[in-house]
């Protein structure tokens, strides 16, 4: 039987602003990537999200981003590898405190947004991020875009890695995600998105926007929790994966 982890970016509310349906989404995912206060989140939100995830038995990961609250961490910044290292160590440390207080362990680290995409294509940034994760805790799993520099860097550093694919994003023929600045970056049809996931898990292939099949590995699937119909989609993909005889469980299980 095929199996896959289902992850979601959570804990992205901050201050007076509520983003996403975290408590509801946690019923359907097996891993949660919790924002650490730089691109989103705040101490109170981090504490509450860790507690909710722990109570539901969902594995927890740090979701470090660039220091860009206004841009939600989705805008590229010119940072050095040393700065990337510092950002990741700092944010892992921030979330670790709440995990320790709740009596649970961290499963993984998944960079957010622009940091994730920049690292996917830069060996220097990826090596710095992987080193930050390894030196913080060598038992952590590094989540990265399937086949990307980030996954390769994690392997070089001696980390366990998870190749990540996306349910609602389109792909280019080189295996990268279509830029969000393009109109066709997101898959709007739920059935199409679910079909893409099932094919990636079962066949290890995805159809690019250019019409070619791209080979990839799918260890974990990212769904988004901040869309208008995020909860509906979370329920649907969990149900359809089960119907396709795909077991959904945390990557570390």
UniProtKB/Swiss-Prot annotation:
Disulfide bonds: none annotated. Signal peptide: none annotated. This is 5-oxoprolinase subunit A. Belongs to the LamB/PxpA family. GO terms for molecular function: 5-oxoprolinase (ATP-hydrolyzing) activity; ATP binding. Catalyzes the cleavage of 5-oxoproline to form L-glutamate coupled to the hydrolysis of ATP to ADP and inorganic phosphate. Pfam families: LamB_YcsF. One of its GO terms (biological process) is carbohydrate metabolic process. It is an enzyme of class 3 (hydrolase). It comes from the Bacteria. It catalyses: 5-oxo-L-proline + ATP + 2 H2O = L-glutamate + ADP + phosphate + H(+). It comes from Bacillus licheniformis (strain ATCC 14580 / DSM 13 / JCM 2505 / CCUG 7422 / NBRC 12200 / NCIMB 9375 / NCTC 10341 / NRRL NRS-1264 / Gibson 46). Keywords: ATP-binding, Hydrolase, Nucleotide-binding. Forms a complex composed of PxpA, PxpB and PxpC. Coiled coil: none annotated. CDD domains: LamB_YcsF_like. The keyword Nucleotide-binding applies. Its EC number is 3.5.2.9. InterPro entries: Glyco_hydro/deAcase_b/a-brl, LamB/YcsF/PxpA-like.
